[in-house]
Swiss-Prot record:
Family: Belongs to the alpha-carbonic anhydrase family.
Presence of keyword Membrane: no
MF-aspect GO terms: hydro-lyase activity; zinc ion binding
Protein name as catalogued: Carbonic anhydrase-related protein 11
Region annotation Disordered: where it falls in the sequence: 299-328
Keyword Secreted: yes
Tissue expression remark: Expressed abundantly in the brain with moderate expression also present in spinal cord and thyroid.
PROSITE patterns: ALPHA_CA_2 (PS51144)
Amino acid sequence: MGAAARLSAPRALVLWAALGAAAHIGPAPDPEDWWSYKDNLQGNFVPGPPFWGLVNAAWSLCAVGKRQSPVDVELKRVLYDPFLPPLRLSTGGEKLRGTLYNTGRHVSFLPAPRPVVNVSGGPLLYSHRLSELRLLFGARDGAGSEHQINHQGFSAEVQLIHFNQELYGNFSAASRGPNGLAILSLFVNVASTSNPFLSRLLNRDTITRISYKNDAYFLQDLSLELLFPESFGFITYQGSLSTPPCSETVTWILIDRALNITSLQMHSLRLLSQNPPSQIFQSLSGNSRPLQPLAHRALRGNRDPRHPERRCRGPNYRLHVDGVPHGR
């Protein structure tokens, strides 16, 4: 059955009417960039998540895919895998630098070509190169992450998006092939303290430079390892990109210990606009795709569920940075 056939009659009528109206209002939208998290932007129809797989044939997996993301992780379904090695981060001993963007959909950090930052270990069979750091957050606390744990959301989610540099030459090619992508997700709560890496991104001097869509600000001397908790476990599953084209070539790795940012930092994020300054303000918050069915996919974790109260200790529960366990 085709994707369009899966629509209810009312939704189909809304879609076709909106497409007809869009054809008569201004220039035609770029089909590769015509999507949003909300169906209506400034009175104009822009395809939201229910329509992603219907407006572009290349995005059909968004509607008919069977391994879509994000998902709700029920901890009782997580299979303990004692053979999962620790995660490894390679920076060549250099500090990270790059550009922080307001894309109109996300807060996005794009690393400079050098140094090359790679992640390996855990469930990954190959080394994956960092392509983007993406921050998603909600309009209210506790409801901003894409993934959930036991039906519980978080205020924000940081996604480190990587491509398999051993099999593919770039992100685009990797997104179309098996074992192509790896995304590390870290959940974020609002608290009285703040993660040191996120503090660099969210301090007043930085965040006010990206108030509007297409604003950008260059950052340097960043220590990516400071983004990670001192010790943590992880849960992994096979899924997809959570934005069009929803390619099902992603190994997701969810860090099981949340980070913190302050309420002031979260408020600053919610003041970012998804529009340029010439248009009406619309908060960048709420930039997440709805949950997708997990179905029969396996969830694996490196922490023994028989000992949930025991803190994870030892080198297997630390990020290894350039070959050395990070933290005390």
